[in-house]
Design a protein with these regions (language model features):
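Histidine/acidic-residue-rich catalytic or RNA/ligand-binding cores of hydrolases
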Residues: 25-28, 168-177, 193, 222-242
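Alpha-helix termination/capping residues and helix-transition junctions
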Residues: 39, 175, 207-208
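Glycine-enriched alpha-helix->loop->beta-strand junction motifs that scaffold or abut catalytic
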Residues: 41, 63, 176-181, 235
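Functionally critical loop-and-helix segments that line ligand-binding/catalytic clefts
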Residues: 198-204, 219
Length: 342
């Protein structure tokens, strides 16, 4: 009998869970972003403008779902220059996605963190009066308090671009109760960073902090569309498997781990059968099985051939595993980590 880690029914929906529009420091309007991403096969777009949640229900149609969300920044405010391109110290960024479509109340509101066009939307900000002018301080205690408040406020919390942020192990390993982290971030990659965060993900998992992994563009679209090497859309994404394209079905699928992160490769099925972890995928050069064990496992192709299926026998002491696909073109797909014995 098969035990599916990613549900076997429903449809996969392509999602960008990190996106900036003219509401903050992006160049494209929310409507322009919808048109662009729909053209490229996306069904879900989280409008994660900086430090302000502005919903876009008018953009909803049968083939496109906007998610209510924002990117919350934590840094040492008195070191912040307030201007794009300037340096500031000690940042941590969190993506907050409202689980329910009618949730527009931000947590940990602080108007001093608004910049670029976001300052023009302050009058539309919705938040609990008890959290007005929340004192954001770059400490693990404060960041954990924000995460907990976000959960109580009905948000799915993603740890964004740890490589871009320059956060180090002794700090980020103290973060607790994250729902997911960005294993890839395309804007950071386009800037020149190696924002493939396998190591950070494993750090959390090995420390007992279980979470999913996602990927997003973090697009700002300041360069000519598609032709410029720094164009930062449609590079990394999250595939979400859900029964239908409805708001709560999509956020519930994220919560349940019915998703994978990619920059080109695909995972079609992931399940356990006869004591083995089995995965079917797009044409791959290599499929690897990573766990809490000292030794990973891998299946490789011979020259001129490709893999579309792999299976692995877990070690008896494996507590969790994750799968990584390396396509013949060098593109990746990352499964979430899943517990083996539950």
């Amino acid at each position: 009998m098969k035990k599916y880690f990613i549900r076997n029914d429903g449809e996969f929906y392509k999602a960008n869970l990190h996106c900036h529009s003219t509401v903050s420091d992006g160049k494209l309007s929310p409507d322009e972003l919808k048109k662009f991403y729909k053209k490229h096969g996306y069904s879900v777009l989280a409008y994660t403008d900086h430090n302000i949640l502005i919903a876009h229900p008018e953009l909803r149609d049968e083939e496109f779902l906007p998610l209510n969300s924002y990117e919350l920044s934590v840094f040492t405010l008195d070191k912040y220059s307030g201007a794009a391109g300037k340096q500031y110290e000690k940042p941590c960024h969190l993506i907050l996605i409202a689980k329910e479509e009618n949730n527009l109340d931000m947590v940990c509101w602080n108007r001093n963190f608004l910049f670029a066009n976001a300052v023009n939307y302050e009058s539309q900000a919705k938040f609990k009066k008890s959290e007005d002018n929340y004192d954001r301080v770059y400490t693990p205690d404060c960041i954990n308090d924000i995460i907990n408040r976000a959960h109580k406020g009905g948000y799915y919390v993603i740890y964004a671009h740890p490589t871009w942020s320059g956060e180090i192990y002794p700090t980020y390993i103290q973060y607790k109760n994250l729902d997911a982290m960005e294993i890839m971030n395309y804007s950071s990659i386009q800037e020149g960073n190696f924002e493939f965060n396998d190591r950070v993900y494993d750090d959390f998992l090995l420390d007992g902090k279980f979470m999913s992994c996602v990927a997003g563009d973090d697009n700002h679209n300041h360069y000519p569309p598609e032709t410029n090497p720094k164009w930062d859309s449609c590079g990394t994404y999250t595939m979400i498997k859900a029964p239908k394209l409805e708001y709560r079905e999509i956020t519930k699928a994220l919560e349940e781990g019915n998703s994978y992160a990619s920059n080109g490769a695909s995972i079609y099925d992931l399940y356990m059968e006869d004591g083995k972890v089995c995965v079917s995928c797009s044409d791959a050069y290599m499929v690897s099985y990573v766990s809490n064990a000292l030794w990973a496992q891998r299946m490789n192709t011979e020259e001129g051939t490709s893999l579309t299926y792999a299976e692995f026998a877990p070690h008896e002491y494996d507590k969790w595993f994750r799968i990584k696909i390396v396509g013949k073109d060098g593109k990746f797909a990352y499964s979430n980590a899943y517990r083996l014995y539950f």
